[in-house]
Swiss-Prot record:
Origin species: Burkholderia vietnamiensis (strain G4 / LMG 22486)
Keyword annotations from UniProtKB, A to Z: Ribonucleoprotein, Ribosomal protein, RNA-binding, rRNA-binding
Gene3D superfamilies for this protein: Ribosomal protein S18
Coiled coil: none
Name of the molecule in the record: Small ribosomal subunit protein bS18
Single GO cellular component term: cytosolic small ribosomal subunit
GO biological process, alphabetically ordered: translation
Assembly mode: Part of the 30S ribosomal subunit. Forms a tight heterodimer with protein bS6.
GO molecular function terms noted in the UniProt entry: small ribosomal subunit rRNA binding; structural constituent of ribosome
Entry similarity comment: Belongs to the bacterial ribosomal protein bS18 family.
Amino acid sequence: MARPTGKKFDKRRQQQNPLFKRKKFCRFTAAGVDQIDYKDTETLKDFIGENGKITPARLTGTKAHYQRQLDTAIKRARFLALLPYTDQHKA
């Protein structure tokens, strides 16, 4: 039996998936940020997972230009001990 592939099926499938609800957008583009500052640890913490890894752009919706800046800023903040390297080190 063939799978149904109509618009009605797609809408129903999207409504059932809880991860599909929120549209991804770049927070930095919306705010008009030019440079991401490594000293703004509250913003940087939003882009670090619970295990200490940097969250990829495909999950956060951050544009590539800002993702590179974000990566550098997080690494600088870690080096200066503003952010922890792992989840076991609480800052």
